[in-house]
């Protein structure tokens, strides 16, 4: 039997602890009132877009190939892949050069849709993965200093707005890559200085740049790799697993043409809330796809 005196002593001690905690809470917790409510509007598409900060300098310091370094692009894609792998609420992602956009499911309630939480979590996961997996793509080429990515959160109220956003980002790939391909061809093969190449391209349109590439350097821009011309789309699809005799869900990296309405017709279920339609993948087995298939086999 616990003595009455001991019981009173323990009760009094517990009362003092609870009283101190209550006083501390009431004394200091008022500072939480200064926190802004950044919950994003419901029933809207949330897009987090990350951009490399001072990446021109970063690419020069690390001797990236011009106009495109396939190692750097594959690293960007893999870093984005780790984001989708960890966060199921990210529906798809699209990247090019030093930029990546992450589209959340319209119905997501992740982190109560708080903008700061979503942005910082996606950015930190992506940035840390870029550093962590550097050696996977650059072998013995050392990472001289960690890169910096800034980010923003944008809301799109309708499916049409989101589709136009995706088309805008892919159109940007074409515009930038055609210019950069022509610019660096003039510098590296045409022996022009960067200033001379810039002056040569001033006022030119797409047809002019294609003409320069083909007539002067026998380069057919249409034959350039799709990853350079279209960027990379990461999307969730299914593949048939012969070992398990069923479909397995994976994240695939593709270079589909999102500027064409055909893509959105073929993927119409993608934007439907809680759609049960399965998007099957029959494309090439990329490194990202192969890695997931091998894990399924194990």
What are these regions, as identified by a protein language model?
Residues 6-7, 12-298:
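Regulatory and interdomain segments flanking nucleotide-handling catalytic cores
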């Amino acid at each position: 039997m616990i003595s009455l005196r001991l019981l009173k002593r323990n009760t009094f001690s517990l009362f003092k602890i609870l009283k101190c905690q209550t006083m501390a809470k009431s004394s200091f917790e008022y500072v939480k009132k200064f926190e802004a409510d950044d919950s994003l509007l419901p029933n809207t598409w949330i897009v987090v877009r990350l951009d490399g900060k001072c990446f021109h300098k970063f690419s020069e310091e690390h001797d990236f190939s011009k106009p495109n370094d396939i190692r750097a692009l594959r690293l960007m894609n893999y870093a984005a892949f780790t984001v989708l792998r960890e966060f199921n609420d990210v529906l798809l992602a699209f990247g090019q050069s030093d930029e990546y956009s992450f589209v959340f499911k319209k119905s997501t309630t992740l982190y109560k849709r708080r903008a700061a939480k979503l942005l910082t979590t996606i950015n930190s996961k992506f940035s840390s993965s870029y550093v962590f997996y550097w050696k996977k793509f650059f072998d013995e080429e050392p990472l001289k200093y960690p890169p910096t990515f800034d980010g923003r959160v944008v809301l799109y109220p309708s499916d049409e707005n989101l589709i136009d956003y995706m088309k805008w980002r892919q159109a940007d790939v074409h515009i930038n890559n055609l210019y950069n391909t022509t610019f660096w061809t003039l510098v590296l093969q045409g022996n022009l200085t960067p200033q001379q190449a810039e002056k040569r391209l001033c006022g030119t349109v797409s047809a002019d740049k294609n003409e320069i590439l083909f007539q002067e350097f026998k380069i057919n821009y249409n034959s350039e790799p799709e990853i350079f011309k279209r960027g990379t789309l990461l999307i969730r699809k299914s593949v048939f697993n012969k070992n398990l005799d069923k479909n397995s869900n994976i994240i695939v990296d593709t270079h589909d043409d999102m500027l064409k309405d055909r893509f959105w017709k073929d993927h119409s279920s993608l934007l439907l809330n809680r759609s049960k339609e399965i998007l099957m993948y029959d494309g090439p087995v990329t490194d990202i796809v192969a890695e997931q298939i091998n894990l399924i086999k194990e």
